[in-house]
């Protein structure tokens, strides 16, 4: 191997704080994330918290936001912005009980604008929480054994796990490890209990953060567990991905993939999405040492000067994959074994009913863009509450923002199915293949980074694309389409067959050629265009696809074969 022996350390944690970015000083001087958050919460003059406290609160799963629909009007009236907060739950693998669902439903109705949001990382978000209500929300979550620690911030984000109920035993094994991984990697500071539960500070015998230290990670770090043949979690988009390898239906171990990440900045060509690289295999009992070793390499060598360059993918491409692997193995004390064979067939959700190995049944419901809300013609939130009141199994959020009513005894299926029909929750049976494989981030009006609409616009755009699909006989074909309101990639648009990222109000970059299994990045086809140009381009390319595709060929593969875009073989060539 061509391994670099002396990597550049001028931008990592080995340097004095005054040589690094301001966020590193903020973290180091925050008293393990305490900052002045208590004082900010007590300040009744403003609905906001201080800028520094807003950054620290991300480590507790909380984002300060404002209603951008009325921002200009409030400015004209010389009022402060209409501040509120988004609260994200830590929910490894997306699994919650009926009692937890009912609590979240109640909190959403009382404090979150009568809605819940299912996310692309298998958890819940509550939006429009007022500052004076945040403790009530977080303490309400505690009542059902949920918290929001590390759902945002420079730490290990929510741990993902394939939702594969038809492989019940294997899923149970992998999910148990994913849940343990979430607990293993979460930060240890007592600040969360002191601020949100109003607990007394406890003395500690050792370091308050034995793994993270005072400055935590350089940037977010994402971990996910995939169970082939499903790649629903988009394992190649994770900083650290584990691909389950089974023998005779029992978990044997994991292939290890490192360096995935999909965020980028349009104005910064040095930023790009990258798919994770599989570097080897470990037995299941080596999982937690491997997590520690890989994370510690990024903790120690990640860029802490430039946050646009701070994700693990850039550390790998700068230091070299061979060096990163060798350093992780040095810390592990053993070499990874060669990767084991595996096959992915899809990164979508099989909607409808399936029966698991244990005889229990599961039904996957289509939740458009993850938005759980009542509308005059579709009382979805009421319907899911009614199911939670009688359901004896679990709820499982998928990485595609859908919802599985899981672990249903055969004798209970008729009652659950009747509620689904009563509340219109079975409408997935009439949806197009494109809509069922669509995904959008929240974007406007609450996300401060959004430059264009996403969740509020994609359903209407899909309706217009469906008219094109009908003309070309493609209505039922599964084609992935994903939209974000900015280039940061929260709905993973850069691995969709059709990707759209916001540039300005009504303007988007259009990407084509992503892999249907999540195994290939797409490539920009049109830049900064409006709806008319998007529909014209899709009419052309989808029509060509309908006429000339090969048997079993997916649209993303065709877009490359037909020459609409070139294949992106490595993330660092994405912007070429």
UniProtKB/Swiss-Prot annotation:
GO terms for biological process: cysteine biosynthetic process; hydrogen sulfide biosynthetic process; sulfate assimilation. Its cofactor is siroheme; [4Fe-4S] cluster. Keywords: 4Fe-4S, Amino-acid biosynthesis, Cysteine biosynthesis, Heme, Iron, Iron-sulfur, Metal-binding, NADP, Oxidoreductase. Pfam families: NIR_SIR, NIR_SIR_ferr. SUPFAM superfamilies: Nitrite and sulphite reductase 4Fe-4S domain-like (SSF56014), Nitrite/Sulfite reductase N-terminal domain-like (SSF55124). Disulfide bonds: none annotated. It comes from the Bacteria. PANTHER family: SULFITE REDUCTASE [NADPH] SUBUNIT BETA, SULFITE REDUCTASE [NADPH] SUBUNIT BETA-RELATED. Belongs to the nitrite and sulfite reductase 4Fe-4S domain family. Alpha(8)-beta(8). The alpha component is a flavoprotein, the beta component is a hemoprotein. This is Sulfite reductase [NADPH] hemoprotein beta-component. It comes from Nitrobacter hamburgensis (strain DSM 10229 / NCIMB 13809 / X14).
């Amino acid at each position: 191997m061509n391994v670099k022996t002396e990597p550049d350390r001028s931008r990592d944690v080995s340097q004095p704080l005054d040589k690094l970015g301001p966020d590193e000083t903020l973290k180091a001087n925050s008293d393990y994330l305490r900052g002045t958050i208590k004082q900010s919460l007590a300040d009744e003059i403003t609905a906001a918290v201080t800028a520094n406290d807003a950054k620290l609160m991300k480590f507790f799963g909380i984002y300060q936001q404002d209603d951008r629909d009325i921002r200009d009007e409030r400015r004209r009236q010389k009022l402060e912005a209409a501040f509120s907060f988004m609260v994200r739950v830590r929910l490894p693998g997306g699994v919650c009980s009926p009692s937890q669902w009912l609590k979240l439903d109640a909190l959403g109705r009382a404090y979150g604008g009568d809605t819940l949001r299912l996310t692309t990382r298998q958890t819940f978000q509550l939006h429009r929480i007022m500052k004076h209500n945040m403790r009530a929300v977080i303490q309400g979550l505690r009542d059902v054994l949920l918290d929001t620690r590390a759902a945002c911030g420079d730490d290990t984000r929510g741990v993902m796990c394939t939702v594969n109920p038809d492989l019940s035993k294997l899923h149970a094994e992998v999910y148990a490890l994913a849940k343990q991984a979430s607990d293993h990697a979460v930060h240890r500071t007592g600040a969360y209990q002191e601020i949100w539960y109003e607990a007394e500070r406890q003395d500690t015998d050792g370091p308050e953060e034995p793994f993270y230290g005072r400055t935590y990670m350089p940037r977010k770090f994402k971990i996910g567990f995939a169970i082939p043949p499903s790649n629903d979690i988009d394992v190649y988009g994770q900083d650290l991905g584990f691909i389950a390898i089974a023998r005779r239906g029992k978990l044997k171990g994991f292939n290890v993939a490192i360096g995935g990440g999909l965020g980028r900045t349009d104005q910064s060509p040095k930023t790009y999405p990258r798919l994770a690289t599989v570097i080897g295999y470990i037995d299941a009992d080596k999982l937690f040492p491997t997590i520690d070793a890989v994370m510690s390499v990024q903790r120690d060598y990640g860029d802490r000067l430039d946050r646009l360059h701070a994700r693990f993918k850039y550390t790998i491409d700068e230091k070299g994959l061979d060096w990163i692997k060798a350093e992780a193995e040095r810390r592990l004390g053993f070499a990874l074994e060669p990767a084991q064979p595996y096959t992915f067939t899809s990164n979508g959700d099989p909607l409808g009913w399936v029966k698991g190995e244990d005889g229990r049944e599961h039904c996957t419901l289509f939740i458009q863009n993850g938005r759980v809300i009542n509308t005059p013609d579709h009382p979805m939130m009421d319907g899911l509450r009614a199911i939670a009141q009688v359901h004896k199994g679990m709820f499982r959020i998928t990485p595609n923002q859908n919802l599985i009513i899981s672990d249903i005894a055969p004798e209970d299926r008729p009652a659950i199915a009747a509620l689904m029909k009563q509340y219109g929750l079975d409408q997935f049976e009439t949806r197009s293949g494109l809509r069922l494989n669509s995904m959008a981030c929240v974007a406007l009006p609450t996300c401060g980074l959004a430059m264009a609409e996403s969740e509020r616009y994609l359903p209407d755009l899909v309706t217009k694309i469906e008219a094109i699909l009908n003309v070309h006989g493609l209505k039922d074909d599964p084609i992935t389409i994903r939209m974000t309101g900015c280039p940061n990639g929260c709905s993973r648009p850069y691995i969709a067959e059709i990707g759209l990222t916001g540039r300005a109000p009504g303007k988007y970059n259009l990407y084509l050629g992503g892999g249907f299994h999540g195994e290939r990045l797409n490539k920009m086809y049109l830049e900064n265009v409006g709806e008319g140009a998007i529909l014209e381009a899709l009419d052309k390319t989808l029509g060509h696809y309908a006429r000339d595709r090969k048997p079993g060929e997916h649209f993303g593969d065709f877009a490359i074969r037909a020459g609409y875009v070139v294949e992106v073989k490595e993330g660092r060539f994405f912007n070429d």
